[in-house]
């Protein structure tokens, strides 16, 4: 029965697997763990129901069971359920299992419980490379990139060699800090100790060098890759675009298409952004209009926001407003902020006020809208209204985010697909 169960789980036939499981009279711990692992891979409420059923039927969970269910709660960011399992773990006697300990660290860190995650890490007696990598990834996830980088040296002092996942995490932390010196150090470790051909590490290096302003180094890494994923091409396109080399970004995209690589929706966000940075209005329209028919990607709000930004930067405010009016769904905050940014740039106060009204009606606590509105009004020497806009920020207790823009929020939401 377990062999059939494993085959069903492997092929994603979870409903059939559960039916077979329920109809069987000779279930053992392997049966439970197999089904639990299947639900953990696509974690949903059924996984939690199965775990509670396992506890209720007094099935003796083992280390694999605890590790699996904790990883599931890490993936679903379900802290309350994870705490219940941790309490059961304490009574079980499997607390010393390194796999269970690693999953416990992962569960706390992905729920942004840094202190609890650190405590769980210190209680892992025989830490392996997964333990340290989970800790580095946890620090990064919790907004502590400097500590994530520090894990790399700490683990080597502890006699544990990093793997490619550790290196990629450390490189991403350097990118987060835009710390080129640390990024180069980590790259040196990769060359000496790791697999310099690993695609994931190289993707992270491209993103890091580009974010640190060393796009030539990013391109060298890109050129050295024997195999490239869509993420690789996307990271390089974005690297050129964000460093003022929009034409080269589009040349990379053209090369991507010539090699038969299909772009995804994030790639096309970066292509449209590159058009905006370069002022390539006609090309932007060509790419935007070809999205659905040629690339099989239906434009979403991020793509419309990029097109509005492109038109706004070029001073085509009326054309941008006309595009917004033709959107097949309700424009979101990003679209109106993109229009407001264009109005700020070209001093179109009337359209800018309209854009700000729409943006604030949708999200009154977004600092970007207030800053763009205030900047536009100040640029028109409308000091009183500019002060009033800043006063509204204070009245609504909006915190100014340094360097925050509508496009940065787009990148933040899609970062997993870029770097």
Per-segment meaning from a language model:
Residues 1-419:
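Terminal (and in a subset, N-terminal) low-complexity or junction segments at the ends
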């Amino acid at each position: 029965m377990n062999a059939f169960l494993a085959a069903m789980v492997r092929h994603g036939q979870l409903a059939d697997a559960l039916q077979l499981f329920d109809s069987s009279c000779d279930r053992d711990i392997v049966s439970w763990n197999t089904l639990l692992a299947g639900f953990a891979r696509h974690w949903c409420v059924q996984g939690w129901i199965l775990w509670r059923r396992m506890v209720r039927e007094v099935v003796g969970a083992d280390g694999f069971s605890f590790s699996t269910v904790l990883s599931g709660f890490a993936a679903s960011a379900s802290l309350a359920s994870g705490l219940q399992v941790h309490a059961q773990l304490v009574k079980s006697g499997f607390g010393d299992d390194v796999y269970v300990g690693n999953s416990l660290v992962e569960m706390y860190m992905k729920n942004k419980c840094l202190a609890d995650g650190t405590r769980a890490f210190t209680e892992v007696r025989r830490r392996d490379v997964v333990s340290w990598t989970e800790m580095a990834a946890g620090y990064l996830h919790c907004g502590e990139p400097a500590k994530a980088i520090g894990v790399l040296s700490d683990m080597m002092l502890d006699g544990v060699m990093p793997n490619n996942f550790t290196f990629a995490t450390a490189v991403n932390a350097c990118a987060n800090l835009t710390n080129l010196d640390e990024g180069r150090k980590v790259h040196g470790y990769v060359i000496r100790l790791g697999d310099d051909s690993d695609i994931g590490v190289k993707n992270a290096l491209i993103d890091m060098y580009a974010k640190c302003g060393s796009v030539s180094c990013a391109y060298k890494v890109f050129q050295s890759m024997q195999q490239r994923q869509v993420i690789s091409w996307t990271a390089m396109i974005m690297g050129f675009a964000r460093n003022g080399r929009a034409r080269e970004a589009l040349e990379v995209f053209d090369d991507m298409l010539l090699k038969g690589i299909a772009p995804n929706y994030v790639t096309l966000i970066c292509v449209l952004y590159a058009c905006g940075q370069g002022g390539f209005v006609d090309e932007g329209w060509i790419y935007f209009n070809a999205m659905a028919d040629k690339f099989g990607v239906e434009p979403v709000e991020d793509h419309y926001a990029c097109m509005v930004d492109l038109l706004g930067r070029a001073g085509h405010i009326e054309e941008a407003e006309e595009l917004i009016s033709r959107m097949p769904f309700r424009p979101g905050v990003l679209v109106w902020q993109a229009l407001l940014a264009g109005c700020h740039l070209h001093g179109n106060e009337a359209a800018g006020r309209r854009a700000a009204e729409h943006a604030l009606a949708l999200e009154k606590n977004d600092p970007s809208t207030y800053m763009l509105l205030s900047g536009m009004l100040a640029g028109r020497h409308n000091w009183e209204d500019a002060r009033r806009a800043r006063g509204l920020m204070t009245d609504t207790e909006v915190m100014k985010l340094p360097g925050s823009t509508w496009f940065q929020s787009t990148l933040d939401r899609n970062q997993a697909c870029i770097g």
